[in-house]
């Protein structure tokens, strides 16, 4: 047993970044209607919802054990994705790349972990495919061992061969 002292609030707490980014991806996948959608390390919950509209695949370094129709669970690392080059039409990776290489989730320590992850994402998304990516942006820094914050240009440089179609931001107060 342990005391829970911070849940008696006047309103329900909301993690706006996670709520809005998952809703954005769900709506985009629903519009695109790909045969398959792959999520790399975001949340199995979102992948479970997407499984209601298309074949969903969730890959994470830490396996999850849930039984959801139309959802394939895969164990693997974003630093070495188990997919062929240019093979995936629809891929999401939400609030993941900023953690890679810091050891927080059992990944190897690697100063270039985020760059390697982005290179792998770029490798597997096929020409004309879609990559839905989110990450903290701001003054570039490492908040060891929690996450990195990126200058937007750093991310654009990691994905030079991609065309940016949409840029959205959710601030710390939950405003779009």
Model regions and ranges:
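Class I SAM-dependent methyltransferase Rossmann-like catalytic core
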Residues: 1-33
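Class I SAM-dependent methyltransferase SAM/SAH-binding core
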Residues: 23-24, 31, 36-81
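A short acidic, Gly/Pro-enriched loop at the edge of an enzyme's catalytic core
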Residues: 79-91
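A conserved beta-strand element that flanks and buttresses the S-adenosyl-L-methionine
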Residues: 92, 97, 101
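Conserved catalytic-core motifs of eukaryotic protein kinase domains, centered on the activation segment
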Residues: 102-107
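A short glycine-rich, Lys/Arg-flanked "PGG" loop and its adjoining helix->strand segment in the class I
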Residues: 109-130
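Acceptor-substrate binding/catalytic loop of class I
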Residues: 111-112, 133, 138-157
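Short alpha-helix
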Residues: 119, 146-171
């Amino acid at each position: 047993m342990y005391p829970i002292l911070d849940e008696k609030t006047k309103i329900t707490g909301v993690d706006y970044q996670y709520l809005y980014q998952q809703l954005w991806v769900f709506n985009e996948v629903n519009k695109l209607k790909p045969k398959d959608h792959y999520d790399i390390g975001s949340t199995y919950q979102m992948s479970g919802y997407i499984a209601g509209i298309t074949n969903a695949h969730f890959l994470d370094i830490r396996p999850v054990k849930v039984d959801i129709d139309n959802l394939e669970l895969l164990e693997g690392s974003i630093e070495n994705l188990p997919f062929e080059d240019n093979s995936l039409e629809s891929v999401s990776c939400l609030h993941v790349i900023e953690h890679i290489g810091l050891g927080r989730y059992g990944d190897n320590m690697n100063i270039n972990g985020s760059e390697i992850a982005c290179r792998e994402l770029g490798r597997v998304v096929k020409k004309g495919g879609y990559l839905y990516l989110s990450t903290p942006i701001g003054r570039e820094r490492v908040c060891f061992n929690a996450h990195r914050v990126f200058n937007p240009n750093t991310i654009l440089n990691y994905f030079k061969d991609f065309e940016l179609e949409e840029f959205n931001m959710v601030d710390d107060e939950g405003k779009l």
